[in-house]
Amino acid sequence: IASPGPGNYITMAKAVASAVSMAGIETVQKGSFIQAHGSSTPKNCVSEADIFDRVAQAFSIRDWPVTAVKSYLGHSLGPASGDQLIGCLGVFRYGILPGIKSVSHIAPQVNNARLTIPLQDCKLEEGQGQIAFINSKGFGGNNATGVVYSPKLTHQWLRKRYGETVFANYQQRNRQVRRQANAYDEAASQGELNVIYRFGQQGINEEDIKIDMNGITIPGFEKPITYATDKQYPDF
């Protein structure tokens, strides 16, 4: 039976240390938040909160904001980390940390001494919400923690590295990309999706595939696919 392991302690601590090296300790302490795995099982609630609290203690973080998109969507399995990322992008854009509204109170066994787990939507103050830690806490050792930096912080770094002139040119070129993205979003919101679906078109005629003892010849490709001829087991 799978159970929590030490892996997530490692990934979470290394992710925070990485962010400290990039953005500085004060930005991490005052400007980061956690997008928890938050699968809401009894073991997950207790063990994940303990990881966050102990990492917070190690890096002198207080009142670390925690949210969990699964409280809205449930566990979408494979796409779950994508759900978390989309949620973080929303926090960056709107400055609102979604509350965990699926519970009436935080269970007493959850160690949240250094955490802030809002049960209602929370408006972040200026300077907060600059760094997101996306946590994946799979029982049995499948653990990962991703670090996502806000557009504001990223733009700050780009200006510092490339200068104002180069950054202004980038912003000018990016306007067209934004217009296209906004147009697509508007169309998608209206259900106007022109999906490209070309099943079987421009494919390879399977009858023209040639197979012999030396290899396989595929129409449209100059070189054939040859078989491996090295004898890996000479004693056989």
Regions found by a protein language model. Give the residues of each.
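Conserved "HGTGT" condensation-loop signature of ketosynthase/thiolase-family condensing enzymes
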Residues: I1-F236
